[in-house]
């Protein structure tokens, strides 16, 4: 399995300047047939300008689940995090969701 992959971006999320997306390869275990890094980056870019309430937090990170996020007519869930005092979004998982 590949290690985490890093991509430069210019986004503002939760009023924070974000300059990097770090994608964990976890999604490839079950979702490689429907999700890839390109799709994940497109989903992350849809967060730009948004304010999101965290689902959980610890001493180091805030954790988020955002769904549905639409891309190319399909619905996805994005599981991501922000590290306090850091300028990146970490993507923990991403996968297709059925439309409701």
Describe each PLM feature range.
Residues 1-100:
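Ribonuclease/tRNase effector modules and their secretory precursors
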């Amino acid at each position: 399995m590949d290690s985490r992959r890093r991509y430069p971006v210019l986004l503002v999320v939760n009023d924070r300047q974000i300059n990097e997306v770090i994608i964990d390869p976890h999604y490839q275990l079950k979702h490689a047939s429907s999700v890839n890094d390109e799709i994940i980056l497109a989903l992350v870019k849809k967060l730009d300008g948004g304010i999101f309430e965290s689902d959980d937090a610890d001493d180091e990170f805030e954790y988020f689940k955002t769904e549905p996020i639409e891309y190319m007519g399909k619905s996805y869930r994005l599981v991501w995090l922000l590290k306090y005092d850091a300028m990146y979004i970490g993507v923990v998982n991403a996968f297709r969701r059925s439309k409701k």
